Regions:
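Sec-dependent bacterial lipoprotein signal peptides
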Residues: 1-20
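Bacterial lipoprotein signal-peptidase II cleavage site
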Residues: 19-33
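Extended ligand-binding regions for polar small-molecule ligands
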Residues: 23, 34-49, 162, 182, ...
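Extracytoplasmic small-molecule ligand-binding "clamshell" domains
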Residues: 31-128
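Bilobed "Venus flytrap"/periplasmic-binding protein-like clamshell domains
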Residues: 85-100, 133-134, 152-208, 220, ...
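Acidic, polar ligand-binding/catalytic clefts
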Residues: 105-169
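A ligand-binding cleft/hinge motif common to bilobed small-molecule-binding domains
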Residues: 116, 133-141, 189-192, 214-248
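Periplasmic-binding protein-like
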Residues: 150-158, 229, 233-268, 289-302
Length: 302
């Protein structure tokens, strides 16, 4: 499950996290495509994040629970047979874990859909969340964000034989599908892009929207281009991405709103990864198989 073309930035490494031949291996790359291999991860030793209640719990447990998506090709997906999670975001979660001093093998990945992310973080059901989670001022009122680690843009997925949709301005009268609680569908609603005569359809998973698109029950699926390209790469004879982004969607790592110490630590991990080129190794072994270049984002500390 690979994405054909997208611009991404993989978070990797951190203070105390380095590449080493003897470290923990990341998620194996999918067969085919580039031969680039994921780097090994060395688990940082004697990590301390003073003033972080979440880190104190992590350290006491010696393990992590990370919220993620399980239905996004190339980003976060779960193998139906093995139950293992794989993808760009999954590797990011593992790299942060190693930087915090926890063996990535001790992560329990928990599927959390878009509409339930804030509650899962607030309840402490997950230590942090990595899953195409767009940073916004509204969300910052409920959760904290480290990053961004990736810059996406909203786009449209349509049937390959449909030439009537060429951008956001051509959605009038169309049925557009996305995930409940997501930034993209709220933008469609706020800007009234389907009016007059159109409608909005919402589901819990993007895969459900894609099924409705293929069965011609909706006209387009909208979300970040990275996600859409993943689905298009699975069925290129029937689906295509319009290719005209109309937003900037900075992906962040969601965590407890009041835990600034942990947020700062993860920002440090991200910055070092960008500076030393480690993120590029991760990108090349995952989303880099799309053939597009990657541009690191600027970390936005607050």
């Amino acid at each position: 499950m690979r994405i054909r073309a997208l611009t991404a930035v993989a978070l990797v490494g951190g203070l105390g996290l380095t590449l080493a031949a003897c470290g923990k291996e990341g998620t194996p790359a999918s067969p085919g495509g580039s031969a680039a291999a994921l780097p090994a991860y060395t688990v940082a030793q004697n990590v301390d994040v003073a003033g972080s209640p979440v880190f104190a719990k992590i350290k006491a447990a010696g393990a992590l629970t990370v919220g993620a998506k399980d239905d996004q090709p190339g980003l976060g997906s779960k193998d139906a047979t093995t139950g293992k999670f794989a993808g760009f975001d999954i590797e990011i979660a593992k790299l942060v874990s190693a930087g915090l001093g926890v063996d990535p093998e001790k992560i329990t990945f928990k599927t959390v859909d878009s509409g339930a992310r804030e509650q899962a973080i607030a309840n402490g059901d997950v230590n942090y969340y990595v899953g195409t989670y767009t940073i916004s001022d509204k969300r910052k009122q409920q959760v904290g964000f480290a990053g961004p680690y990736y810059q996406a843009g909203q786009d449209l997925l349509v049937r390959k034989d449909d030439s009537s949709i060429t951008g956001q301005e051509t959605l009038k009268g169309k049925k557009v599908c996305s995930v409940t609680g997501s930034t993209p569908i709220q933008r469609v609603r706020d800007q009234k892009l389907t009016e007059p005569g159109g409608s909005i359809v919402e589901f819990q998973k993007y895969s459900q929207c894609v099924e409705k698109l293929l069965s011609k029950e909706v006209d387009a699926v909208t979300t970040d281009d990275a996600i859409l390209k993943g689905f298009a790469s699975q069925d290129p004879e029937k689906l295509k991405v319009v290719g005209k982004t109309f937003s900037k969607e900075p992906y962040g790592i969601g965590l407890n709103k009041d835990d600034k110490a942990l947020r700062d630590k993860i920002d440090d991990i991200l910055q070092k990864a960008i500076d030393d080129g480690t993120w590029k190794k991760i990108y090349d072994a995952t989303l880099g198989k799309s053939g597009s270049a990657a541009t690191p984002p600027a970390i936005e500390r607050y």
